[in-house]
Amino acid sequence: MPKQPNLNQMMRQVQQMQDEMAKAQEALKTEEVEASAGGGMVTVKITGALEIKEIRIDPDAVDPEDVDMLQDMVLAAVNEAIRSAQELAEKRLGGAMGGLQNLGLPGLGL
């Protein structure tokens, strides 16, 4: 019969993991990533918590005859910034979640 994990030890590990997750989530509020589109004509800065902090548009990108192009560049830059921020969050929060593997709980696939 496999050795059962110590309940007190498991609770301490869960509490430690919760603390690490809270710290990582707080840090994501201040960490920023940047993405651009149109060769840098549109740039978006976003936090790891998915709050857009800045959108910069090069004046050369503004063509009243081609508003659709500008809209497409803004959309592409925002979507790329979101993807980058999500990758950052996965990296930061994944480290905090690593503690689950050490709990030895059967059935969690960890």
Question: Where are the language model's segments positioned?
Answer:
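Long amphipathic alpha-helical segments used for membrane anchoring, targeting, substrate engagement
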Residues: 1-30, 34, 84-110
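A short, well-structured alpha-helical segment
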Residues: 68-72
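N-terminal intrinsically disordered, cationic/polar leader segments
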Residues: 30, 36-53
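Residue-level signature of catalytic and energy-coupling elements of molecular machines
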Residues: 14, 50, 74
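A broad detector of the eukaryotic-type serine/threonine protein kinase catalytic domain
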Residues: 6, 57, 78-79
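Stable alpha-helical structural segments in soluble proteins, enriched in small hydrophobic residues
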Residues: 73, 77-88
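A short interface-forming secondary-structure element
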Residues: 39, 55-67
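Short, exposed beta-strand "edge-strand" segments with a Pro/Gly-rich flavor and a Y/T-containing core
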Residues: 2-3, 53-56
